[in-house]
Curated annotation (Swiss-Prot):
Topology in the lipid bilayer: Peripheral membrane protein
Domain ABC transporter, residue spans: 2-246
Residues binding ATP: G35, L36, S37, G38, A39, G40, K41, S42
Subunit field text: The complex is composed of two ATP-binding proteins (PhnC), two transmembrane proteins (PhnE) and a solute-binding protein (PhnD).
Taxonomic placement: Bacteria, Bacillati, Bacillota, Bacilli, Bacillales
Name the UniProt record assigns to this protein: Phosphonates import ATP-binding protein PhnC
One GO CC term on file: plasma membrane
Highest taxon, organism lineage: Bacteria
Gene giving rise to this polypeptide: phnC
InterPro entries (alphabetical): AAA+_ATPase, ABC_transporter-like_ATP-bd, ABC_transporter-like_CS, ABC_transpr_PhnC, MetN_ABC_transporter-like, P-loop_NTPase
Compartments in which it is found: Cell membrane
EC number: 7.3.2.2
PANTHER family in alphabetical order: AMINO ACID IMPORT ATP-BINDING PROTEIN, PHOSPHONATES IMPORT ATP-BINDING PROTEIN PHNC
Organism: Bacillus cereus (strain ZK / E33L)
Length: 257
């Protein structure tokens, strides 16, 4: 379980990114967070693995505080958290296989991984992960030779090879076309269902949130204004999240035909 206890984030310029967030996400959930740009979605997501440090409160993972964790303890906790970015975050000149093996770095010494000395078991896991997202044939291609959708699937394979217990996906389909968007989200959903990996995804599209989430969390101005099951997320609720009906109506356009 991931638990946010009175979590707030204030940036150096005084902007409040998060305001007294109290939230529990159970193991195996597929949670989609929605809200306008600047609502606090990325800040909340990235605070889980401390890519963004909070200024108040505490974040617990399986009863252990990642907020207070240091050194080896922090590295161990981060090893269980896979991160998927909008920009893919791949080493473009490296092969797909090497990018996926980067998910194993936290399990070995720096020297060993720098020299690329991964055991046979890691290689097998990397190949299995690529097969899982239907991109095994690209294992020896350079990452920059792949389409955007293929690169994002490499990112998912990296999280699988990492054997992550939690996957955080920050706007993973924002730069993708509708068909590729469906493929990437289908992969994330199937992995969540098959392996029970807790998955938190930030999305702008209300239609996609309704299609894939088991639970939707709406943020507005750094605060949670909605937290409920998909069937509870009515148009009226989304109007509250997005602040005005015109914006809501635009976002309600079907993203995947």
């Amino acid at each position: 379980m991931i638990e946010f206890r009175n979590v707030s984030k204030v940036y150096p310029n005084g902007t409040k990114g998060l305001n007294n967030i109290n939230l529990k996400i159970q193991k195996g959930e597929f949670v989609v967070m929605v809200g306008l740009s600047g609502a606090g979605k990325s800040t909340l997501l990235r605070s889980v693995n401390r890519l963004h440090e909070i200024t108040e409160g505490e974040i617990m993972i399986e009863g252990e505080s990642i907020t207070a964790a240091k050194g080896k303890g922090l590295r161990r906790m981060r090893r269980d958290i896979g991160m998927i970015f909008q920009s893919f975050n791949l080493v473009k000149r490296s092969t797909v296989l090497k990018n996926v093996l980067a998910g194993r770095v936290g399990y070995h010494s720096t020297l060993r991984t720098t020299l690329g000395l991964f055991p046979k078991e890691d290689l097998e896991l990397a190949f299995q992960s690529l097969k899982r997202v239907n991109i095994l044939e690209k294992a020896y291609a350079r990452a920059d030779e792949l389409s955007g959708g293929q690169q994002q699937r490499v990112s998912i394979a990296r999280a699988l090879a990492q054997e992550a217990k939690i996957i955080l996906a920050d706007e993973p389909v924002a730069s993708l076309d509708p068909l590729t968007t469906k493929q990437v989200l289908d992969d994330l959903k199937k992995i969540n269902e098959d392996f029970g990996i807790t998955t938190i995804v930030n999305l702008h599209s209300i239609d996609l949130a309704r299609q894939y989430a088991t639970r939707i969390i709406g943020l507005h101005a750094g605060e949670i204004v909605f937290d409920g099951l998909v069937e509870e997320a009515t148009d009226e609720k989304f109007a509250e999240i997005y602040g005005d009906v015109a914006q809501k109506s635009k976002l309600l356009e079907v993203a995947v035909k």
